[in-house]
Design a protein with these regions (language model features):
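Gly/Ser-rich "nucleophile elbow"/oxyanion-hole loop immediately N-terminal to the catalytic nucleophile
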Residues: 134-149
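Hydrolase active-site cap/lid region
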Residues: 164-219
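Gly/Ala-rich beta-loop-alpha elbow adjacent to hydrolase catalytic centers
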Residues: 151, 155, 159
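Short beta-strand element of the alpha/beta-hydrolase
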Residues: 71-81
Length: 309
């Protein structure tokens, strides 16, 4: 399928500009550019409420649907940004949309970023944040039995590894995982890194430079650097994966679907056509975002089917 019209225009502009390299940006410019890209998001959903809180020294953004009462299901969200950028500012529109469309509380974690903080800082923050939310569930107004871990790109990676860490401790388990074009393979072994790695704004260079700044010499096949290769998925809760047709990460996301099913995990996967990595944040220009947002919101409160669509 060809690129969606709005995304095709963005891609054409990127190519016309000479395919700017993320490696040539300093980290401040890279982060500022990500924040600037929020102008491409959907309109701000103002019918929800949002507040930032600090628990046990960690900062969270809590987005609540209108008239929230009782113990609500929770989407615990890890933002993307290749481990080096992103945060509440870049993801606020999506957090608000998810809270509105799902009727759940959406809680975002601000984890430490590279290059200031290298592996395993983000992983440790992701796990610790999940445990804090579980511990304070009553105070937060959420049902601790209905916590879904979700995230996009690097955040999808952190959601998966956090669930694996929680499984190993057997303290508690999330109800579901929602992984939006997750970064899973620091070795860049899958074909879509080549076929989609140059022209589609979030390039091979963008993704791998993020991995490099975060991993800082860690073995690229380390089970928490490249979780796609793990053999201990059995026992995870149901998982849903979103992939994008023109994404360097497309193939590894779909390979994860097969590996999870092979290891006995209930898993669904949907490839969105005509879109690129990061499309979930392009609601102002992409039609696919609307259906993806509705689908993700629905899956938080609905059973998984175990089929790939």
């Amino acid at each position: 399928m060809p690129l969606e019209k709005g995304i095709a225009e963005l891609v054409a502009g990127f190519i016309a500009a000479g395919r700017p390299s993320s490696r040539e940006q300093n980290i401040d410019d890279r982060r500022a550019g990500y924040i600037a890209s929020t102008s491409l998001a959907d309109e701000k959903e103002i019918r929800v409420s949002s507040e930032d809180i600090v628990l046990e020294g960690m900062t969270f953004r809590v987005v609540s649907p209108p008239n929230a009462s009782g113990s609500l299901p929770c989407i615990l969200y890890y933002h993307g940004g290749c481990f080096v950028s992103g945060g509440f500012l870049t993801h606020d529109p999506q957090l608000r949309q998810l809270a509105w469309k799902s009727g759940c509380k959406v809680i975002a974690i601000q984890y430490r970023l590279a290059p200031e903080h290298t592996f395993p800082a983000a992983h440790d923050d992701a796990e610790r944040g999940a445990n804090i939310v579980y511990q304070y569930a009553e105070q937060l107004g959420i049902d601790r039995e209905r916590i879904t871990l979700a995230g996009d790109s690097a955040g999808g990676h952190l959601a998966l590894v956090s669930a694996l860490r929680l499984k190993s401790t057997a303290h508690w388990s999330p109800a579901k995982l929602l992984l939006i074009y997750p970064m899973l393979d620091a070795t860049a072994s899958f074909p879509s890194y080549a076929s989609n790695g140059q022209d589609y704004i979030i390039t091979r260079d963008t993704l791998l430079s993020g991995f490099e700044m975060y991993l800082q010499g860690t073995d690229l096949r380390h089970p928490e650097a490249s979780p796609i290769w793990r053999e201990d998925f059995a026992g995870l809760p149901p998982v849903h994966i979103l992939t994008a047709e023109f994404d360097p990460l497309r193939d590894e996301g779909e390979a994860l679907y097969h590996r999870l099913n092979d290891q006995g995990v209930a898993c669904t996967c949907q490839r969105y056509l005509g879109v690129i990595h990061g499309f979930f944040q392009l609601g102002g220009v992409s039609q696919a975002v609307r259906s993806a947002m509705r689908d993700v919101a629905w899956r938080v409160v609905s059973p998984s089917t175990g089929k790939m669509t």
